[in-house]
C-alpha cells in the first residue's frame, strides 16, 4: 500500500512553516505500507509523523512492571523514589484471610503465622500463573496487579481453588477462609519502600469490593464481568447493587464462587 501526500495539502502555520492541523483526520496505512510526501517548492520543509495511539507491543513501564521476574529483580529501579507514574488502566486484586485473628488466639502466634505465610505462597503462584504480580502483603492480605481484568478474574478463581486444596492439607486450615475483590481503572504508581506501589481511587474501590465478599467469594464489577469471555473456574452466583464509599452512585456487582462451590 502506498499513500502520497502533496506538501501543498498541509496547513501553513505562522512564520511560513508548514504542518498538519491536529484536527485533521488520522491517516490509516496498512501494515507494511509506504508514505510518500512530495515537496513541490524550492525551500526544504520538515515533516513530522506521529502515532496517535500507543503501539500495542510497546514495552511501557506498566507492562514491564507486570513481569514477575522484572518486579523481583529490578522493579525498584523502574521509578525514582517519590516520582509518580500515571497509568491509564490497571486491574488490582485484594485478598483477605477470614478467621485469621481468631486463629492467632486459638493456636498461638507461631502456628498461625506459618499458615498465613504459607498461604501467601499459594496466592502468589495463582497470581503469577495469570500474568499478575503481588505488589505487597499487608498483615494477612495481598494486593496484586494485572494487565487486564480477565487475567485478574481467572487468577482469583485459581487462588480460591488452590486455597481450598491448601486448607485441606494444612493444620488448622478449616478455621480460615479466603475472600477476594478486584477493580480496574487509572491510578498512580510510585516507588515506596524499595518496591512499586499503587495509589488512587481505583485502589480504594478494589479494596472495598473485597470487603463485600464472603469466604470463598470474589466480587467484581458487573460490566467488567460481562466483558470477560473466560472466567476460569469462577461462576456467577448473584448480582447485587452496593454503595461503595467514595463512589457517588451505587455499583452493580457480581458475586462469584468456584464452579464446584457454586450453588446450582
Where are these regions (language model features)?
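Beta-sandwich interaction modules
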Residues: 3-33
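Regulatory cytosolic signal-relay segments
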Residues: 29-88
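A conserved hydrophobic position in a structured secondary element of the catalytic/binding core
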Residues: 65, 95, 220
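Helical mechanochemical/support elements of P-loop NTPase systems and associated helical scaffolds
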Residues: 66, 119, 138, 198-205
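Catalytic NTP-binding/metal-coordinating core of nucleotidyl cyclase/transferase enzymes
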Residues: 76-162
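Catalytic beta-strand-to-alpha-helix segment of the class III nucleotidyl cyclase homology domain
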Residues: 144-263
